[in-house]
């Protein structure tokens, strides 16, 4: 059973790494462009209260 959970954890980490490279699958709220620089890869602008991560 521990091996099963270890495999699930590895898959979850890998899928999150892929999402980070391709852009987040969810909306990231921001107040300034500096917030997006910390939360998204690259340096996306803050538009209408959300980061343009994709």
UniProtKB/Swiss-Prot annotation:
GO cellular component: extracellular region
Predominant localisation class: secreted
Compartments where found: Secreted
Leader sequence residues: 1-23
Lineage of source species: Eukaryota, Metazoa, Ecdysozoa, Arthropoda, Chelicerata
Keywords, in A-Z order: Disulfide bond, Ion channel impairing toxin, Neurotoxin, Potassium channel impairing toxin, Secreted, Signal, Toxin
UniProt-recorded Gene Ontology molecular function terms: potassium channel regulator activity; toxin activity
Tissue localization of expression: Expressed by the venom gland.
Family: Belongs to the short scorpion toxin superfamily. Potassium channel inhibitor family. Alpha-KTx 14 subfamily.
Protein name: Potassium channel toxin alpha-KTx 14.x
């Amino acid at each position: 059973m521990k091996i099963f959970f270890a495999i699930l954890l590895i898959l979850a980490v890998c899928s999150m790494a892929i999402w980070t490279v391709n852009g987040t699958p969810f909306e990231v709220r921001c107040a300034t462009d500096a917030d997006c620089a910390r939360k998204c890869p690259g340096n996306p602008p803050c538009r209408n209260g959300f980061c343009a991560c994709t």
